[in-house]
């Protein structure tokens, strides 16, 4: 019989007000965790004072120097005493039944190492959205779930660290990778998915809130660009099926290149996808949409193409 103790790990960086909001959401859980561990990434006297006053039962750990989210999470896990690990970033929140429902699903799972996640609310300056639109199929691998789209609609798949419940034992094999500038959660998930007995368990309930209103605040992760992500993908090609590999190149990394307005990405990504991947129709279409955005297609033509493509390609399943 599986144990049911949960350790919550919260990495933080110089934003005590947001951290207290996150800790309040943990304190409101219908299934209280065994312990809450806050890992302060570098100097943080103000954070220590705020947490000790508002949540005195929280375990406070501190890294001597700023080391990034991967090191902070790993340090928290290494000091955890629970049999399950849940992560919460300091600027995010949980809804009250998050731990209750995810732990119940984990204990029922047939996988040796179930990775449990659910829908979440994404709060942006443009409004609120629910993601992901679909969970993984029972036999769908991690890489193909993330990068082999079944529709053109945004938000079809989504994975986020604050929305996870993971067996503590799995971290004995796969930790977060220090030095990973971005996609640290996805990098971990892809590597964890290679461990025999690992599987994704998806809950359709909405259980977490990802707050993205303030893009100028300091973050633990740091900056990045599409070239960094391209190097990451090519260095870790063994983690992808050929179709998933073309998906990460033509859709996900191309999306970052569009945000940077860097046209050089077009040839680089297409060449790699054609030579080492297996692009499907939806990936090709989304890549073309990215090209139109990069090279300045008239907005009317751009929107017309997106509408026509949505009409003639599969909807969500």
Model-assigned labels for residue ranges:
Residues 63-80:
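Glycine-rich, basic loop-to-helix element that forms the pyrophosphate-binding segment
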Residues 139-225:
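Conserved nucleotide-sugar donor-binding catalytic segment
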Residues 205-214, 218-249, 263-276:
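Catalytic core of nucleotide-sugar-dependent glycosyltransferases
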